[in-house]
């Protein structure tokens, strides 16, 4: 096992512990608490993959951080903070929408890279809006926290979430997963729109109906689907 992988996990465990203390003292806001919960799931997945105990890793991580801080000068810390780009946390969903439990009548689950897509295939002929909470850096989506699909009545019918065991994803991973989710929902004659916030930072462009532009891969898949449907209709006639 790579030593850098282990030490990175140990430091992440300790930093999560520090952030948990901030929340326990009621010093964290809603986005801070949201990230804490998501990172907890990620650490559990990484710990299982690496076969490392989180409590023991936290203690070692503390020693690593203390050693670094002891060697770090105030001037170097100021320079690091000044040169680091700042990310922003954007929310389409409320805390209630983000944390609400939901179930599927006809569940379908697919893994697309480091992201998990869940769709309720029982949903038909609905107007659906995709909302997401995510971080942005350089005016581009950086990290997806959670994306959910809502009907006009407020029911959750789909979801995209990072896999705890595979931390890290790109904007292309997110766009591909959204394409899969939209395709699955539209297959049952649902009309799907994407929130303006997500359109802006994931695509920087969109159709007037709120649907993001299709990638070449999605266009080819849609063309095959249409041809297949036309053939079935002709056979039925």
Curated annotation (Swiss-Prot):
State the compartments where it is located.
Host nucleus; Host cytoplasm
Establish whether keyword Kinase is in the entry.
Answer: no
Family matches, as Pfam families: Flu_NS1
The keyword Lipid metabolism appears for this protein? no
Motif Nuclear export signal: positions: 137-146
Please indicate the residue ranges that the annotation assigns to the motif Nuclear localization signal. Answer: 34-38
A GO-annotated cellular component: host cell nucleus
- Molecular function GO labels: protein serine/threonine kinase inhibitor activity; RNA binding
Keywords on record: Eukaryotic host gene expression shutoff by virus, Host cytoplasm, Host gene expression shutoff by virus, Host mRNA suppression by virus, Host nucleus, Host-virus interaction, Inhibition of host innate immune response by virus, Inhibition of host interferon signaling pathway by virus, Inhibition of host PKR by virus, Inhibition of host pre-mRNA processing by virus, Inhibition of host RIG-I by virus, Inhibition of host RLR pathway by virus, Interferon antiviral system evasion, RNA-binding, Ubl conjugation, Viral immunoevasion
Using the UniProt annotation, give all residue ranges assigned to the region (RNA-binding and homodimerization). 1-73
Q: What segments bear the compositional bias annotation Basic residues?
A: 217-237
Disordered: annotated span: 205-237
UniProt's post-translational modification comment states: Upon interferon induction, ISGylated via host HERC5; this results in the impairment of NS1 interaction with RNA targets due to its inability to form homodimers and to interact with host EIF2AK2/PKR.
Ranges where the record places region CPSF4-binding? 180-215
Q: Where is this region: PABPN1-binding?
A: 223-230
Entry's Gene Ontology BP terms? symbiont-mediated suppression of host cytoplasmic pattern recognition receptor signaling pathway via inhibition of RIG-I activity; symbiont-mediated suppression of host gene expression; symbiont-mediated suppression of host mRNA processing; symbiont-mediated suppression of host PKR/eIFalpha signaling; symbiont-mediated suppression of host type I interferon-mediated signaling pathway
Q: Which family does it belong to?
A: Belongs to the influenza A viruses NS1 family.
Q: How does it assemble?
A: Homodimer. Interacts with host TRIM25 (via coiled coil); this interaction specifically inhibits TRIM25 multimerization and TRIM25-mediated RIGI CARD ubiquitination. Interacts with human EIF2AK2/PKR, CPSF4, IVNS1ABP and PABPN1.
Q: Note what the entry says on domains.
A: The dsRNA-binding region is required for suppression of RNA silencing.
The job of this chain, per UniProt, is described as: Inhibits post-transcriptional processing of cellular pre-mRNA, by binding and inhibiting two cellular proteins that are required for the 3'-end processing of cellular pre-mRNAs: the 30 kDa cleavage and polyadenylation specificity factor/CPSF4 and the poly(A)-binding protein 2/PABPN1. In turn, unprocessed 3' end pre-mRNAs accumulate in the host nucleus and are no longer exported to the cytoplasm. Cellular protein synthesis is thereby shut off very early after virus infection.
The molecule here is called Non-structural protein 1
């Amino acid at each position: 096992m790579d030593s850098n992988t282990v030490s990175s996990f140990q430091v992440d465990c300790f930093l999560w512990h520090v952030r948990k203390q901030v929340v326990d003292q009621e010093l964290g806001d809603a986005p801070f608490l949201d990230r804490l919960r998501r990172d907890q799931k990620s650490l559990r997945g990484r710990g299982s993959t690496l076969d490392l105990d989180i409590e023991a890793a936290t203690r070692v991580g503390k020693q690593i951080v203390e050693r670094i801080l002891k060697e770090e000068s105030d001037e170097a810390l100021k320079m690091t903070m000044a040169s680091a780009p700042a990310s922003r946390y954007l929310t389409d969903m409320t805390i209630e929408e983000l944390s609400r439990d939901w179930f599927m009548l006809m569940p379908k689950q697919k893994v697309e890279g480091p992201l998990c897509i869940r769709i309720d295939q029982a949903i038909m002929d609905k107007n659906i809006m995709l909302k997401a909470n995510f971080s942005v850096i350089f005016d581009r989506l950086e990290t997806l926290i959670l994306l959910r699909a809502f009907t006009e009545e407020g029911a959750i019918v789909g979801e995209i979430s990072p896999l705890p065991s595979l931390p890290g994803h790109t904007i292309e991973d997110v766009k591909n997963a959204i394409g899969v989710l939209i395709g699955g929902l539209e297959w049952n004659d649902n009309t799907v729109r994407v929130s303006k916030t997500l359109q802006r930072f994931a695509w920087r462009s969109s159709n007037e109906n709120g649907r993001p532009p299709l990638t070449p891969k999605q266009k080819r898949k849609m063309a095959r689907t249409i041809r297949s449907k036309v053939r079935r209709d002709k056979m039925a006639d």
